[in-house]
Amino acid sequence: MIKTHNTKIIAVNRKAKFNYQLMETFEAGISLLGTEIKSARSGNVQLRDAFVNIIKNELWLQNTHISPYIMAHSENHNPIRPRKLLLHKREINKLISKTREANMTIIPTKMY
């Protein structure tokens, strides 16, 4: 269950409810770089075209645009680089089996 009373919602994918039939929801962590964290906290995230790709039994978030952090020095992150999702092994196996057997897609709906 997602607790939203103490969390700040960073980004919402509003088109996901209209373009897809949402079957289940999962909560996952995401591996971010330092400048990505600061940019995400300021709300510079786009989830509209994002999806999850399965590579070597790991879940990778693709096409999520996190804008470069303005106050960063010359080294900044790639805005649309793949980002690893962090879940328990049993949750990863469940999602992989569902996507392969029923030809489903994993879509991010909210980032907080």
Regions found by a protein language model. Give the residues of each.
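Beta-rich strand-turn-strand
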Residues: L86-Y112
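Acidic-enriched and Gly/Ser
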Residues: N53, N76-L86
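Short, surface-exposed beta-strand-loop junctions and turns on beta-sheet-rich folds
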Residues: K38, Q46, N53, I66-Y69
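Short, charge-patterned binding micro-sites
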Residues: Q62-N78
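A structural signal for short hydrophobic beta-strand segments in well-ordered beta-sheet cores
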Residues: A50-I54, M111
